[in-house]
Amino acid sequence: MNLKGKNILITGGSLGIGKETAKFLVDKGANVLITGRSEERLLAVKDYTGAKHIVFDIADIDNISSKTKDCLNLLDNKIDVLINNAGTGCRRDVEQLNIDDFLHVYNTNVFGLSILTKEIIPNMKKQNKGTIINIGSTASLKGYKGGSIYASSKFAVRALTQCWQAELRPYNIRVCQVNPSEVPTAFANKERIERENIENKLTTKEIAHAITSAIEMDDRGFINELNVWATNPFN
């Protein structure tokens, strides 16, 4: 896909991977709309990237339909690429599990992601093409201690990705999951303060590069899943 002039919606675009991906895509000539919960942060990203913005909490399930209409209006009623990046985390051992923590994570990572995608699919079907990028995690490949809530939410995203691939390929809609390993960001940080880069760890730039590369592949092909690891994070 040639990105010049393409309309792209990125959820969770006010920080981290979403912010850097917006920068990559705008620099390629795309029309990018980012969502987030903080007007202040969105305005800062607008200055950094040149992307449009809208205050939109993906976890507010009841408002997704109306907010999707607002997004479409800001993108001339056409979305070429949806990047489901918004996400949150929670670390709990099995004896600490509770329904409130599950709902907090699943409302964003699974339910909000699914309902937003459902709302946008008719627009892509009308065009008979489109690309959906789901941001997963290497936690969707293997569980870990304390990962019951977060890892299971990303396993769910992986299942959704595979189901949508089977359903949407006949409409020329590509669905790809990008699984970053650890990236120091504001993710799971209550204060939502960006973390400093750590030597030998991935940065948001590597993930933004992977996402952009997956989108730019010619439309006749697609990458079904892309795992991104740091080469040598152990030093």
For the regions a language model picked out, list residue spans one by one.
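Substrate-binding pocket helix/loop in short-chain dehydrogenase/reductase
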Residues: 93-94, 101-103
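C-terminal helical subdomain
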Residues: 170-173, 177-178, 195-235
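Active-site-adjacent segment of SDR/Rossmann-fold oxidoreductases
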Residues: 142, 163-173
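Residue(s) in the substrate-gating loop at a strand-loop-helix junction
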Residues: 137
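Conserved glycine-rich cofactor-binding loop
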Residues: 14-15
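Active-site helix of classical SDR
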Residues: 117, 153
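The beta1-alpha1 cofactor-binding region of Rossmann-like NAD(H)/NADP(H)-dependent oxidoreductases
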Residues: 55-67, 99
